C-alpha cells in the first residue's frame, strides 16, 4: 500500500494545478467578455452622428462651382460658368438651403442672359424714342443714299463733267455714301438694342470712317478754295482742255491718303466695353481706351492723341476749312473788284459760271460748319463736364454727335444738286427718263420744232450722258455751265 501515497500526492498536485488554471482561464475569459461588451457599448451604432467615416464625408472644399446643367439643345448655351465667392453658402449668417437659391439667381435662364433687347415691342416709354430714332434714321439714310449715288453716277457717265472739280465733288459723295451705308445701321442698331454689330471691329472702323470722311470734306473744301483763288489771280487763259484721268486720280489720292493717315489713331484708340444690363444680358459701348498690348512708343503716341483729340478735332476739321474758304473768297472778291464792275477780258457767261462756282464753295462750307458745330460743342462739353453729367446725358450727346455726321452726308448732295446747275439738270433729266416713258415720244410728235432747238437738245443730252466722237473744244475750268 506504500505505492498509493505517491499516487495520491501526484493526484492532489494535478488537481490543484488544474483547478487554478481553470479558474484563471475562467477569470480571463470573463474579463475579456466584459471588455468586449464595454467596447461594443462604447462604439456608436451605424447611422449615428458620431460615426467616424461620416466626418470624412463632411469635407468642404475651399471653393465650389456650379457647372451648367443639360438644357434643351434649342436654347442658348451660357458662355461661362458662374462661381461663388463664399466657400459655403450656408455660412455667413445664411440659413440652410439658401445656397441653392443663390446659384439659381446667379445662373438665371440662358435665354434671358443672352437675348437682344427689343424696345419696339411690347410698347413702353422707351419705345417712342426708339421709333423716333428709327424714323429719323430712315429719312436720313434714304435721302443720303439717293443723293450721293446720283452725284457719283452723273459725274461718272458724263464726259464733259469729268474735271478735277467735279471729281472732288464725286469723291466727297463717295465718302458720305460709305459713312451712311456702313456706319448708320451699326450706330442705330447699337442705340436701340444696346448690342454692337461686329463687336470690337465696328468700334474701331466706325470712328475711322467718320474721321476720314471729315478729312476728305476738309481737304476738298481747301482744294476748291485754292482753285477759285487760282482762277481769280491767274493771268493765263481761263479755259483749258478736260483733264486726264491720271491728273485727276493724283489729286484725289492726295486728299484720300492724307485724310486716312490722320484718321489712323482712331483705330488704336477705341475699344469695346461690356457692362451688365439692369434687366438681362450685357450692354455694349465703345470707349476711348488704348490697348495695353501696344508697344510703348505707339501707346504713348495714342495717349498724346487722346489728350489733344478734342482741340485737334476742332482746329483741323472745323476751323481750317472755314478759314481757308473765307480767306480765298475775300481775296477773290478783292481781285475781281466790286460786283458792279466786270473785267473787260471776261465775258458775261464766264462771269456767271465763276459766280456759280463760288456760291457752290460757300454753300458747302456753310453746310459743313452747320453740321459739325454741334459735334464740336458736344466734344468740348464731354471733355470738361463729363464728371458732372449723368449717363443718359452723355448717351444723348453721343447720339447728337453721330447724327451730325449723318446729316452732313445727307444734306451735301442735295445742296450740290440744287446749286450746281449742270448736276441738277442732269438729275432731272435722268428722273424724267426713268419715270416718264413718254419723254421720247413727245420729241417725235413735235414736228414743228426748229432746227436750233433740235441742235440744242442734242448738245444738252451729249453733255451729260454721251461721249462725243471727237475731242471736245476747250472748256472752262471747273464745272461746265
Curated annotation (Swiss-Prot):
GO terms for molecular function: G protein-coupled peptide receptor activity; G protein-coupled receptor activity; peptide binding. PROSITE patterns: G_PROTEIN_RECEP_F1_2 (PS50262). Residues 25-134, 189-205, 273-310, 382-398 are extracellular. The modification Phosphothreonine is found at residue 479. It is a multi-pass membrane protein. GO terms for cellular component: ciliary membrane; plasma membrane; receptor complex. This is G-protein coupled receptor 37-like 1. Glycans are attached at residue 105. Highly expressed in brain but not in heart or kidney (at protein level). In the brain, highly expressed in cerebellar Bergmann glia (at protein level). Detected in the hippocampus but not in the brain stem or neocortex (at protein level). In several key cardiovascular centers of the central nervous system including the caudal and rostral ventrolateral medulla, the nucleus of the solitary tract, and the A5 nucleus, detected close to, but not within, tyrosine hydroxylase-positive catecholaminergic neurons (at protein level). The lineage of its organism: Eukaryota, Metazoa, Chordata, Craniata, Vertebrata. Residues 25-55, 75-101 are annotated as: Disordered. Its main location: membrane. Residues 156-167, 227-251, 332-360, 420-481 are cytoplasmic. Disulfide bonds join 203-286. G-protein coupled receptor. Has been shown to bind the neuroprotective and glioprotective factor prosaposin (PSAP), leading to endocytosis followed by an ERK phosphorylation cascade. However, other studies have shown that prosaposin does not increase activity. It has been suggested that GPR37L1 is a constitutively active receptor which signals through the guanine nucleotide-binding protein G(s) subunit alpha. Participates in the regulation of postnatal cerebellar development by modulating the Shh pathway. The modification Phosphoserine is found at residue 471. Residues 1-24 form the signal peptide. Disruption phenotype: Premature down-regulation of proliferation of cerebellar granule neuron precursors in postnatal mice, precocious maturation of Bergmann glia and Purkinje neurons, precocious juvenile motor abilities, and improved adult motor learning and coordination. Early activation of the Shh pathway with increased levels of Shh, Smo and Ptch1 earlier in postnatal development than in wild-type mice. Increased aortic diastolic, mean arterial and pulse pressures in females but not in males. It comes from the Eukaryota. Undergoes metalloprotease-mediated cleavage which reduces its constitutive activity. Ubiquitinated. It is found in: Cell membrane; Cell projection, Cilium membrane. Residues 78-88 have a biased composition (Polar residues). Keywords: Cell membrane, Cell projection, Disulfide bond, G-protein coupled receptor, Glycoprotein, Membrane, Phosphoprotein, Receptor, Signal, Transducer, Transmembrane, Transmembrane helix, Ubl conjugation.
Amino acid at each position: 500500500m506504500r505505492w498509493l501515497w505517491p499516487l495520491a500526492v501526484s493526484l492532489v498536485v494535478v488537481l490543484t494545478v488544474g483547478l487554478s488554471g481553470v479558474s484563471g482561464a475562467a477569470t480571463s475569459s470573463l474579463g475579456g467578455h466584459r471588455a468586449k461588451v464595454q467596447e461594443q457599448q462604447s462604439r456608436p451604432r451605424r447611422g449615428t452622428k458620431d460615426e467616424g467615416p461620416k466626418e470624412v464625408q463632411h469635407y468642404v472644399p475651399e471653393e465650389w462651382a456650379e457647372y451648367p446643367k443639360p438644357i434643351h439643345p434649342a436654347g442658348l448655351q451660357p458662355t461661362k460658368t458662374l462661381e461663388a465667392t463664399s466657400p459655403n453658402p450656408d455660412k455667413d449668417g445664411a440659413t440652410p438651403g439658401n445656397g441653392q437659391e443663390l446659384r439659381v439667381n446667379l445662373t438665371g435662364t440662358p435665354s434671358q442672359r443672352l437675348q437682344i433687347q427689343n424696345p419696339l415691342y411690347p410698347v413702353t416709354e422707351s419705345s417712342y424714342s426708339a421709333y423716333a430714332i428709327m424714323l429719323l434714321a430712315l429719312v436720313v439714310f434714304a435721302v443720303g443714299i439717293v443723293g450721293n449715288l446720283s452725284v457719283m453716277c452723273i459725274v461718272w457717265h458724263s464726259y464733259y463733267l469729268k474735271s478735277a472739280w467735279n471729281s472732288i465733288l464725286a469723291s466727297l459723295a463717295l465718302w458720305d455714301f460709305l459713312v451712311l451705308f456702313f456706319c448708320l445701321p451699326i450706330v442705330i442698331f447699337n442705340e436701340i438694342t444696346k448690342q454692337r454689330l461686329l463687336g470690337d471691329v465696328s468700334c474701331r472702323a466706325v470712328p475711322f470712317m467718320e474721321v476720314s470722311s471729315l478729312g476728305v470734306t476738309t481737304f476738298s473744301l481747301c482744294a476748291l478754295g485754292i482753285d477759285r483763288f487760282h482762277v481769280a489771280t491767274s493771268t493765263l487763259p481761263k479755259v483749258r482742255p478736260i483733264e486726264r484721268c491720271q491728273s485727276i486720280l493724283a489729286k484725289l489720292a492726295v486728299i484720300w491718303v492724307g485724310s486716312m493717315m490722320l484718321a489712323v489713331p482712331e483705330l488704336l484708340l477705341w475699344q469695346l466695353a461690356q457692362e451688365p444690363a439692369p434687366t438681362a444680358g450685357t450692354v455694349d459701348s465703345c470707349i476711348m481706351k488704348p490697348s495695353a498690348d501696344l508697344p510703348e512708343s505707339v501707346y504713348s503716341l495714342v495717349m498724346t492723341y487722346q489728350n489733344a483729340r478734342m482741340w485737334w478735332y476742332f482746329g483741323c476739321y472745323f476751323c481750317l476749312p472755314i478759314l481757308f474758304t473765307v480767306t480765298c473768297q475775300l481775296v477773290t472778291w478783292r481781285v475781281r473788284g466790286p460786283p458792279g464792275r466786270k473785267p473787260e477780258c471776261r465775258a458775261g457767261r464766264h462771269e456767271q459760271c465763276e459766280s456759280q462756282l463760288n456760291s457752290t464753295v460757300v454753300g458747302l462750307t456753310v453746310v459743313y460748319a452747320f453740321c459739325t458745330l454741334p459735334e464740336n460743342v458736344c466734344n468740348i462739353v464731354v471733355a470738361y463736364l463729363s464728371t458732372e453729367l449723368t449717363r443718359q446725358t452723355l448717351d444723348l450727346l453721343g447720339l447728337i454727335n453721330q447724327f451730325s455726321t449723318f446729316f452732313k452726308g445727307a444734306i451735301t448732295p442735295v445742296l450740290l444738286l440744287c446749286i450746281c446747275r449742270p448736276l441738277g439738270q442732269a438729275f432731272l433729266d435722268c428722273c424724267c427718263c426713268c419715270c416718264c416713258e413718254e419723254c421720247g415720244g413727245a420729241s417725235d410728235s413735235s414736228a414743228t420744232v426748229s432746227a436750233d432747238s433740235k441742235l440744242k437738245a442734242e448738245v444738252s443730252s451729249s453733255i451729260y450722258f454721251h461721249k462725243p466722237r471727237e475731242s471736245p473744244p476747250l472748256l472752262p475750268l471747273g464745272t461746265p455751265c
